């Protein structure tokens, strides 16, 4: 995997990689056999230097965790979408937007867009997303883990999208958009009761800290009980393209 953070930069041109310009941060992956992927990590403008046909996979930003006096909610992961067989014209600018993760006490994630596709950010916590967030009630009297791969989370409102959140919707693809965990705190670290985060970037707990969703996964942030507790932010989204397959 090759990362670039320069602006602008001409990437590709070796092996199976196409030549292109991109104004943001990205990573290129050579899958072998003439196959390739480009992961867009920050927003920017993509310009292919030759005509190409691509598939695109998009993940919206995850929601932040939310804390209440007697309960905690993990943020849901961002929604995902896959678009196939998109024709791109050489020397044409294509805008790519990477959705921000939600912040504060349960803030919603932002949408990711590009290449005719849009993936919505997760709704405000507790709310719908790619995979639902965890739920924790007073002293662990209710402990429900977060969802992953499109599954529902712990509360009735923390629902998943009901379809896979794997890359390009394929069974071998990496997981994205996991729901965030939830922690109830009473009496210091020894008093923490925790509902697990979902696979695919959901934020967990470390000591007394509610962790954010992982960057560029659309994972939900961890929620921690208490109206003044610092909540885990949602993970930013991502846009990935590959040669059409």
Regions found by a protein language model. Give the residues of each.
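Low-complexity, glycine/proline-biased repetitive segments and flexible coils/loops
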Residues: 2-245
